[in-house]
C-alpha cells in the first residue's frame, strides 16, 4: 500500500485511508516495542491532510501522539500541527508551531525547513525565505548521516523553490510551465507543499 501511494497513485489514497482506520480500530498499530512508529505516524497525518480530513487528522494527533517514542514526540507533534494548519491556510499558526524548533534528526529538520519555506512563500516573507534556503542548503551538505536520495530530493526541492520565489518577486522570467518541466527532468516527487505552491 505504501509503495503504491508513494508512486503517486491518487485514486489509491481513499483505500489507504480506510486501511489505516481499520488498523487503528483493531489496535494493531504499535510495533514490537509497544510504541507508535514515527514513520507510520507521519504517514497517517499526511494521508489525512491529503484527503482533507481535517477533523480526523486533528483527533488522530491528539489521541495517538502520546504513544510516539518519547525522544521525538514533541517535535513530531509540533510538525504534525504545523502541517495541518498550513493545509488549512492558517500560515501564522503553522509558523507558531515551528517557533524555536530545532529538529533532533534530519527528517524533522527537513520537514520544518520545508514548512517554513512554504509559509514564507505564501506570506510574501522573501527575506526570511532566502535566509532559510541558505540555512537548509548548508544543513544538507554538512550532515553526512542524511541518505543520498534524501539529499538529492531536498536540493531539488530548493532548486524548484528558488525558481518559484524568483518568479514571484520578478527576479526571473521563468514561467510555471518551465518549472513543471524542470520537476519532471529532475524526477522531483510531487509533494503537498510543492503542489500547493504551483496551484497559485
Q: Where in this protein do the model-derived segments appear?
A:
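Generic helix N-cap/helix-start motif at coil->alpha-helix transitions
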Residues: 1-2, 32-42, 70-79, 107-113
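Helix-turn-helix repeat elements of alpha-solenoid scaffolds
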Residues: 8-22, 48-60, 86-95
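Solenoid-like repeat scaffolds
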Residues: 21-35, 62-72, 99-108, 135-146, ...
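C-terminal structural cap/anchor segments
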Residues: 77, 81-150
Amino acid at each position: 500500500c505504501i509503495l503504491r501511494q508513494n508512486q503517486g497513485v491518487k485514486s489509491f489514497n481513499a483505500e489507504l485511508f480506510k486501511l489505516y482506520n481499520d488498523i487503528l480500530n483493531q489496535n494493531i498499530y504499535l510495533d514490537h516495542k509497544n510504541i507508535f512508529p514515527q514513520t507510520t505516524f507521519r504517514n497517517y497525518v499526511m494521508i489525512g491532510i491529503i484527503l482533507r480530513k481535517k477533523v480526523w487528522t486533528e483527533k488522530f494527533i491528539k489521541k495517538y501522539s502520546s504513544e510516539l517514542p518519547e525522544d521525538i514526540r514533541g517535535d513530531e507533534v509540533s510538525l504534525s500541527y504545523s502541517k495541518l494548519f498550513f493545509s488549512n491556510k492558517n500560515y501564522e499558526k503553522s509558523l507558531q508551531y515551528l517557533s524555536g524548533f530545532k529538529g533532533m534528526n534530519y527528517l524533522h529538520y527537513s520537514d520544518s525547513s520545508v514548512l517554513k519555506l512554504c509559509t514564507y512563500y505564501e506570506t510574501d516573507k522573501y527575506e526570511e525565505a532566502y535566509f532559510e534556503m541558505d540555512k537548509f542548503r548548508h544543513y544538507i551538505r554538512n550532515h553526512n548521516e542524511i541518505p543520498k536520495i534524501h539529499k538529492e530530493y531536498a536540493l531539488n526541492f530548493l532548486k524548484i523553490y528558488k525558481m518559484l520565489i524568483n518568479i514571484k518577486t520578478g527576479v526571473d522570467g521563468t514561467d510555471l510551465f518551465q518549472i513543471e518541466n524542470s520537476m519532471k527532468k529532475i524526477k522531483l516527487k510531487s509533494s503537498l507543499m510543492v503542489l500547493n505552491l504551483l496551484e497559485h
